[in-house]
Amino acid sequence: QEPLLADNILPIEFSNRNNAMRENVYTRKTAIELLKNGGVIAIFPAGAVAWSRKKGLPVEEENWKPMLGRLINQSNCDVMITKFEGQNSKFFQIASRFNQIVRQSLYLYEIKKSLDKPMKFNILKYLKNEDIPKMNDKSLSLHLQRELKKNVNLRIK
């Protein structure tokens, strides 16, 4: 993990290394404990940032992963659905079309580039935990993605 970001980002291991799963389970447990204790986390619920599949096409987001539902179901946290304005650089969009590893390696570049700069975002919906439907992890994640889509013009793959 990039030392500059260590205080602000919980690490996710994308490689196939032997201990990758163990590290990701630890990160998930850490996130759940943060949420149970009133902490706040921001995640990319699709497991990645949105990106443009072809030149000239708008940025699209993948379906949200069950991890979001798991974090909510296991921590009983409230949820604030937020949409950040803008997108990553053209270089990121072009490189993303060629190789997933290149795209992942450019995340740090994009994050570091935006540190200590104002970011525009919209809070679209705040959900108290008692108002969140009781669903399995995957169904809950997709339900929340549909809630976001109702409130903003966002393409979903």
Model-predicted segments: where are they?
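Catalytic core of membrane glycerolipid acyltransferases/transacylases, capturing the structured
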Residues: 1-22
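Non-catalytic C-terminal accessory region of glycerolipid acyltransferases
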Residues: 25-157
